[in-house]
């Protein structure tokens, strides 16, 4: 079957967010290794680095986003770019199909579940579409029921019910719901409905997950969306760390890690989207300083509200922090997590980061920002028991305590042991004969027959 894939081209269209671009390009690599030619259509905003992927064809389309719109929240940005990009995308895809040679047939489009117009466009051009979901399958399965949960009367949550489970959405707790929905409210409902409806009309659903992490949820996904489901993750496990980052990575942090003792460093990163207040920033700084544990802290420029970078830190606090740690603007995360010196990860629990931490066997301290991160963190702390949940308390004493428990105490050792077991299970999934390895072959043959 593999020889037949030569001469077939797959079109990929990532959503222009760091957490969506990386998985799409990793998927492109997976398919390219299996004989498919790759074309990536992308927006001007957050354009991927074509030079890092010389074997792929990159086609840029205008997105019409103003600087003001780029600074808006993720939901506003998604709404605007879905409006602006439809016509340019249609024109670009039509041109690719018209110019495709008989010797290299375009077989399908694979795009992110957050694009709402691509199913209609692909149908109008008679091109099969597959959906890539960069969330945990358990979370995506809840898309049809999230509007019902929002109106169920769980919010606002009383103190006595805060730790109660959400019956329709275990292991989520009622206190998590306000951060799942954020300020979106009912604005979210039409978006969720459109995602579900276009996924049901697609030719397949791809997850960067595996049966070892959520077998029952993957089975349920097939029942909910009524399309073939391919769990082929974790994507990054198939290749060495790639340079798909939209941010400039500070490689000096690897040299700094080289000088640290094994499993002694707590790595701190809240991802590419989460923002915190100046007060929260200072609490994290003091908690890390007081823990006396070596740390590598990623502070993304603009991530502290009202500040360009680390200006809120006093000179005295900077000196105290520099005694034990290193602060950078962005880090090569996969390399950091794989480094022998890294012993823990204080994370926002985006699905990419959670998977990367599991694959490298690094236990977590959970500080989710919102949306799917709330569910991911509950699985880490309550189901898999491979991390400690801060329960939203960004307080120096809580952060110091969590770091000490994870890095120094017996409970941290138990967490580390459970993490090793899960790491080994997930590792098997991507090896020959593993569930994800087999699912990739099934996906490749599915694309061949479209």
Swiss-Prot record:
Cited InterPro entries: UDP_glucos_trans
pH dependence as annotated: Optimum pH is 7.0.
A Pfam family matched in the record: UDPGT
Top EC class for this record: transferase
EC number: 2.4.1.-
Keyword list, A-Z: Glycosyltransferase, Transferase
Activity control: Inhibited by olomoucine and 3-isobutyl-1-methylxanthine.
Gene Ontology molecular functions: cytokinin 7-beta-glucosyltransferase activity; cytokinin 9-beta-glucosyltransferase activity
Entry-linked CDD domains: GT1_Gtf-like (cd03784)
Entry binding sites for UDP-alpha-D-glucose: 272, 331-333, 348-356, 370-373
GO terms under biological process: abscisic acid-activated signaling pathway involved in stomatal movement; cellular response to water deprivation; cytokinin metabolic process; regulation of anthocyanin catabolic process; seed development
Function, in words: Involved in the N-glucosylation of cytokinins. Catalyzes the formation of both the 7-N and the 9-N-glucosides.
Family: Belongs to the UDP-glycosyltransferase family.
Name of the protein in question: UDP-glycosyltransferase 76C2
